[in-house]
């Protein structure tokens, strides 16, 4: 899909489908803006008959109004004093999704005077493209409806020289993350994830290292391998490196949880635990690899970025880890496994230690780690923890710019008491109360405390069961845009 602009006299514009945004204010003068496709007086009469006043989220659709236009969709944006970027993005996203089956090209005209920057235009373009996303890989009968190929913005005089190149690159990263998360577990295996990572490296000139089980054993990754040994599929520890040309001013590690399927192990997932959905337990690694794809194309200056994924399955066989086993992580700390379904933090323990040994300035890990965060924050907001106020503030700012909502949670040190073990350095789970906090406290034990760190729990945000805003039902690709924006802000 491509983005384009039409900056010439609108009387010369030609198109089939137009989305037109209006404010909840005097309608007649706003309709004058589209006199190039229809008589404003005729349109005002039709709009008035529908009692449409531009209320936020309300839409009107007109077919074949004029020979110059097949479809006109008018979307209400609400009062100008209440107008915000998120509302515009969600409104346009919902409309694009409704029209993609009918059009190869959609044109958009909005009250651009209320858009404050090129970044906001780019993010609006992101929203339109990501709303139009479809995944038909596993359908026997391919979709024979039209495929949206172009989104055109009309009359962007305020932003004449705008470029959508980075916008497309970021969207490609999000779309990759969505495809990875949505892929069934017999399709996206640890082996396939390593192939996808290697392809990113090949396409964008990244260094790639894939560690096999023996390599991980040599590094002492007893926590990660304890999870992996219950599966007949070999684990793959993935490490991509993106190095900027010229002097490196900062080194960063992005770590993603990579469970391509999580049965729960001997603490088997049952009942409402949604075992059938546990293909998305690699949502963190999908975000990291999606960011690698986008950043590999963007090539930010002055940075060395490491993308790390400890990929495996959590399954049950004769070799699977038992509840009560004690394992040793690669930093030498011992862990009593009191719950085999708290496996993600075990894989992350060794992944974070590996990242820490690279001596980065910052580490950010993303993981579908706990159900507790879903109870706390629902499905629209991801929780995050950080040991550094500057990093936390930068991450919050990036998430706000990217339109992915984060909420900072406390690293409540008193809760570490719940992780104490009588026979090992710690247990892998604490009490039920505060479960997402104790999970973060567990992770904090596996990297140099001098390194700035943030942990993002995306268990509630990596998937949606229904169309919502810019996300069609299914995988959301949550986290890619925030990571990329955080890097771009450097």
Swiss-Prot record:
Paste the cofactor note.
Binds 2 manganese ions per subunit.
Primary location group: cytoplasm
Question: Gene Ontology cellular component?
Answer: cytoplasm
Q: Name one GO molecular function term.
A: metalloaminopeptidase activity
The catalytic residues are: 269, 345
Q: Which domain of life is it from?
A: Bacteria
Enumerate the Gene Ontology biological process terms.
proteolysis
Enzyme Commission number(s) of this protein: 3.4.11.1, 3.4.11.10
Residues recorded as binding Mn(2+) 1, renumbered to this chain, are: 262, 341, 343
* The protein's enzyme class: hydrolase
Gene3D superfamilies recorded:
Leucine Aminopeptidase, subunit E, domain 1 (3.40.220.10), Zn peptidases (3.40.630.10)
Q: Which reaction does it catalyse?
A: Release of an N-terminal amino acid, Xaa-|-Yaa-, in which Xaa is preferably Leu, but may be other amino acids including Pro although not Arg or Lys, and Yaa may be Pro. Amino acid amides and methyl esters are also readily hydrolyzed, but rates on arylamides are exceedingly low; Release of an N-terminal amino acid, preferentially leucine, but not glutamic or aspartic acids
Q: Where found, per UniProt?
A: Cytoplasm
Q: Where does Mn(2+) 2 bind?
A: 257, 262, 281, 343
Q: Which cofactor does it need?
A: Mn(2+)
The UniProt entry, under PROSITE patterns, shows:
CYTOSOL_AP
Query: Which keywords belong to this entry?
Result: Aminopeptidase, Cytoplasm, Hydrolase, Manganese, Metal-binding, Protease
Write down the HAMAP family for this protein, in alphabetical order.
Answer: Cytosol_peptidase_M17
Q: What role does it play?
A: Presumably involved in the processing and regular turnover of intracellular proteins. Catalyzes the removal of unsubstituted N-terminal amino acids from various peptides.
Cited PANTHER family: CYTOSOL AMINOPEPTIDASE, LEUCINE AMINOPEPTIDASE-RELATED
Q: Which family does it belong to?
A: Belongs to the peptidase M17 family.
Please state what the protein is called: Probable cytosol aminopeptidase
Tell me the organism: Prochlorococcus marinus (strain MIT 9301)
């Amino acid at each position: 899909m491509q983005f384009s602009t039409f900056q010439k006299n609108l009387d010369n514009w030609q198109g089939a489908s137009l989305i037109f945004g209006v404010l909840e204010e005097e309608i007649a003068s706003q309709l004058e803006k589209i006199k190039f496709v229809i008589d404003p007086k005729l349109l005002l009469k039709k709009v008035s008959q529908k009692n449409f006043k531009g209320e936020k989220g309300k839409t009107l659709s007109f077919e074949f109004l004029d020979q110059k236009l097949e479809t006109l969709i008018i979307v209400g944006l609400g009062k100008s004093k209440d107008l915000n970027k998120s509302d515009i993005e969600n409104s346009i996203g919902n409309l694009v999704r409704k029209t993609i089956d009918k059009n190869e090209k959609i044109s958009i005209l909005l009250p651009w005077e209320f858009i404050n920057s090129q970044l906001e235009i780019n993010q609006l373009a992101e929203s339109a493209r990501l709303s139009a996303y479809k995944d038909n890989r596993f359908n026997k009968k391919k979709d024979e409806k039209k495929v949206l190929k172009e989104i055109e913005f009309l009359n962007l005089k305020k932003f004449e020289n705008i470029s959508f190149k980075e916008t497309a690159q970021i969207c490609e990263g999000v779309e990759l993350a969505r495809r990875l998360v949505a892929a069934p577990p017999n399709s996206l295996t640890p082996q396939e994830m390593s192939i996808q990572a290697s392809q990113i490296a090949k396409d964008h000139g990244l260094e790639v290292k894939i560690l096999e089980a023996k390599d991980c054993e040599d590094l002492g990754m007893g926590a990660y391998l304890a999870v992996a040994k219950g599966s007949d599929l070999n684990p793959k520890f993935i490490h991509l490196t993106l190095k900027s040309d010229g002097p490196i001013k900062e080194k960063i590690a992005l770590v993603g949880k990579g469970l391509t399927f999580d049965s729960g192990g001997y603490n088997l997932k049952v009942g409402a635990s949604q075992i059938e959905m546990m293909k998305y337990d690699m949502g963190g690694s999908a975000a990291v690899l999606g960011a690698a794809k986008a950043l590999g194309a963007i090539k930010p200056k002055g940075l060395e970025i490491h993308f790390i994924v400890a990929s495996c399955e959590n399954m049950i066989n004769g070799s699977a880890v038992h509840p009560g086993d004690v394992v040793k992580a690669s930093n030498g700390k011992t862990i009593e496994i009191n719950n085999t379904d708290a496996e993600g933090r075990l894989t992350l323990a060794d992944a974070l230690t590996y990242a820490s040994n690279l001596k980065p300035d910052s580490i950010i890990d993303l993981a579908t780690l706990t159900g507790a965060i879903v109870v706390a924050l629902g499905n629209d907001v991801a929780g995050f923890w950080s040991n550094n106020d500057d990093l936390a503030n930068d991450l919050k700012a990036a998430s706000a710019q990217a339109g992915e909502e984060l909420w900072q949670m406390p690293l409540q040190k008193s809760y570490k008491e719940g992780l104490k073990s009588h026979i090992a350095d710690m247990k892998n789970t604490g009490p039920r109360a505060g479960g997402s906090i104790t999970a973060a406290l567990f992770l904090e034990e596996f990297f140099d405390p001098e390194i700035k760190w943030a942990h993002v729990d995306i268990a509630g945000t990596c998937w949606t069961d229904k169309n919502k805003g810019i996300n069609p039902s299914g995988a959301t690709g949550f986290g890619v845009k925030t990571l990329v924006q955080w890097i771009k802000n450097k």
